[in-house]
Amino acid sequence: MANDSGGPGGPSPSERDRQYCELCGKMENLLRCSRCRSSFYCCKEHQRQDWKKHKLVCQGSEGALGHGVGPHQHSGPAPPAAVPPPRAGAREPRKAAARRDNASGDAAKGKVKAKPPADPAAAASPCRAAAGGQGSAVAAEAEPGKEEPPARSSLFQEKANLYPPSNTPGDALSPGGGLRPNGQTKPLPALKLALEYIVPCMNKHGICVVDDFLGKETGQQIGDEVRALHDTGKFTDGQLVSQKSDSSKDIRGDKITWIEGKEPGCETIGLLMSSMDDLIRHCNGKLGSYKINGRTKAMVACYPGNGTGYVRHVDNPNGDGRCVTCIYYLNKDWDAKVSGGILRIFPEGKAQFADIEPKFDRLLFFWSDRRNPHEVQPAYATRYAITVWYFDADERARAKVKYLTGEKGVRVELNKPSDSVGKDVF
């Protein structure tokens, strides 16, 4: 087993953007398959779990897990590696990458920042649209791109429920809520917001931000419900695809719980989910080539404010069906200069990144696949967010077939009881 060596002439930024764990999507402290030298893993356990799938495309594979992985560094090509014996010989680094870029002053505004030494003049080309109060909606400058979801085996589960009841199509999303165009007092209908802002922003940039989504009162009620869940001990450690590998807490430091929206004390969270569904329903058929026919339950997440975050990763690296990530933030008076906690998105193939501050009543959409690697930078104050993932019908169906035929690296679980983590909504 040969390790990748450092040196000049290393991979380009676009090549680095395509290097991630084939199983969980993690993008740091990678190990390279020493046989084909084109696939990467964050640990040997994930390599073993992915072998049944990977051996079909691994050059020189012999039908068994006979190849190993070596530590990957981004700064140079490695010499050709000899085919290792069936027993892997390289030790996995036990220290997971926890490095984050420090949040700068302007990084808290939801605008694009250039990665040094990119030209700052090329960084900002915001897409603005209706929002409530004095707020505005900003989409980052990025090609159609694609979390926070956890790469979590129990996230997906077959269900056949209808979308939750929601407001009349075209109506405002909440009685006293936002979605008002700048300078206007009349709420912007969900249909107009979806078709005139979200659809074009997503198709052009792959990232879309809507501020003052539901209004101060509704946002406060959602925050109260989330804090009540936290105070009553409903949150547990965020999970990875596999808990067999070490340092999972170094990879993600959040506490989470899963909500359907019908639980006692979660009625306003249910309203939020219905409002998200309204927007997606209006967008459906117009977001790329996706046909959205379901979603997960809501993942309510809390970073406790002790400097934890979530390292750079991809929500859906393996075609599990998730196509759109939708995140709602609950953090009043958030100051990223003091509290950090920025969601930084690295759109594939772009010299810029997008910094999204987790501001109160802010809604964020982005593609869930490999086009949008992202990280949550260390948070030094309690940071709350609610995330829902929407499924593409065709990719979801293919993922289920892969699971049923033994390609379990897709991590789709079927036929779970109704109180399990994930849920399809049709």
UniProtKB/Swiss-Prot annotation:
Changing R371H: In ECYT3; decreased interaction with HIF1A and EPAS1 and decreased enzyme activity. The modification Phosphoserine is found at S12, S125. Residues 120-129 have a biased composition (Low complexity). Residues 89-103 have a biased composition (Basic and acidic residues). The modification S-nitrosocysteine is found at C201, C208, C302, C323, C326. It is found in: Cytoplasm; Nucleus. Its cofactor is Fe(2+); L-ascorbate. Its main location: cytoplasm. Changing R252A: Reduced C-terminal ODD domain (CODD) hydroxylation of HIF1A. According to PubMed:11056053, widely expressed with highest levels in skeletal muscle and heart, moderate levels in pancreas, brain (dopaminergic neurons of adult and fetal substantia nigra) and kidney, and lower levels in lung and liver. According to PubMed:12351678 widely expressed with highest levels in brain, kidney and adrenal gland. Expressed in cardiac myocytes, aortic endothelial cells and coronary artery smooth muscle. According to PubMed:12788921; expressed in adult and fetal heart, brain, liver, lung, skeletal muscle and kidney. Also expressed in placenta. Cellular oxygen sensor that catalyzes, under normoxic conditions, the post-translational formation of 4-hydroxyproline in hypoxia-inducible factor (HIF) alpha proteins. Hydroxylates a specific proline found in each of the oxygen-dependent degradation (ODD) domains (N-terminal, NODD, and C-terminal, CODD) of HIF1A. Also hydroxylates HIF2A. Has a preference for the CODD site for both HIF1A and HIF1B. Hydroxylated HIFs are then targeted for proteasomal degradation via the von Hippel-Lindau ubiquitination complex. This is Egl nine homolog 1.
